[in-house]
């Protein structure tokens, strides 16, 4: 049964997410459109919840609650969550299939309109473009005016013609979703992926606890402190708006400090100058403090948390559609500040007590402290502690495994420091972290992080944030790393050649460790060792007049612009996608193993999982780490290791 609903809530869906959205006292379902797959597309039924046909409603509810009937929706998490709240009955994800996730697995846009257009659906099957205005009118509160009689909500009787359009729009969404599903049905989703999505939905439904009293204190103090800093900057500079770059640059020039651009990096550079005038130093320090946008994550926590102080829906399944990794939603847990404070627990204790004066004295400007405390706002359930376990250097391990770089695999098997071992292979001398040739370890580290996916000098610069390696040595480091890793270099070439071959000859090309390239209906597929496939939609070779070479291009969502369009790829990039996809599949198997032991995974970030564990369960860390390090049947010879720790709040060990 295909389902689409239209809803009302005074809570902003985009800001708060669906779980807080349905907790609004005025939340309601307005329209329900549904169809059974044997009805034919002209037979979509629409229930107007203001004037519902009892027989139709009974038919819908009976099917909805029948575990034998599979329900489909585009972004099924929304329909599941709303219908569960509305009917006060559970909506097990095992009974649902998400058409949006299906689209994402094929590299298509994750929105109904975008997916329909990318698939070239005919106009009568596309999403109705009038929808946004109708949602604004009926599904959100309206501003009270004299004209509308000071009402705060539009009902069907306020504009019957618009209401009829809304019903048509709701019906059309089912038509579009069903047509997308029909078009994509030839591409089979592995059952293991459906099971993983169900686990993901249970995890999002359960959520993670937040220390809301602490978050409230931080937001309240930070608002006040930002105002104080703003006023101090105005007083020091005499500027009306010290946030204005143009005004600030003029003022800096008047102080004898020329800065062509005022960015995070240029300010850091300027603050290193011992001769910088004190007044300028203070103004730049204030600007840096005011630029700490990470504090906004606390405000999101306040908007998005549920009544039980849990945050739900923070992970999007298959959100990174090149690799299939999860993406962060609401509070972006994938880009949190590192923990560098000398005593994180003390800083957190001071925040919980609201003693920000002592915090400032001990740790400096609070904006910087707050950015490091974001992780600590996530707390275990009552009577529990967190066990955090992550894969140690998972991408380096997977890359070496698929390439067959034996010396790297052996180093991991023996538990050696991979940065020291890499530097040793590059420079042909022993390298120890705190001993012989230790100065070379940094070169090894930056090279491991920068060079694995065909990265050159540019990638080295991005990874060497501290500028530890002189610029004139960067190319030599790249060359040394490539010389030490011939199997990885060969893998880049093999992947690019495999992609070109399947595009031109429409045949399967197999590489080692179960990786295979194929070409179906104009799309490039890469089969992974797990059996899952990566998809590059509408892949072809395209001549670039700038270099006279044919490049591999496909249609995809641009990571910067978020627009659907042509994207180029090459050997190293394909290797990156494959490596990260295999790392994701390793995490997925470990999550399923941990869940099978009865443990409650509350969230996961990159390659680590955070598990809510009862305090009396003293063996949990050992058992969870063992799950992470256990061999995977489809990856024989891949050395995995789980590193973990226990903590009373989330943190980076």
Model feature map: region roles:
Residues 2-3, 74, 95-98, 378-394:
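Conserved catalytic palm subdomain of right-hand nucleotidyl-transferase polymerases, strongest
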Residues 627-635:
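A common structural junction motif
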Residues 184-196, 586-609:
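Active-site palm subdomain of RNA-directed nucleic acid polymerases
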Residues 1, 61-65, 369-385, 592-596:
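A short acidic-Thr-Gly-centered motif at the start of a beta-strand
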Residues 1-110, 118, 344, 400:
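Conserved RNase H-like, two-metal-ion catalytic cores of nucleic-acid enzymes
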Residues 616-623:
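Short, conserved charged micro-motifs
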Residues 1-13, 24-27, 31-34, 42-43, ...:
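Conserved "right-hand" nucleotidyltransferase catalytic core of DNA-directed polymerases
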Residues 257-260, 427-597, 639, 643-653:
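Conserved catalytic core of nucleic-acid polymerases
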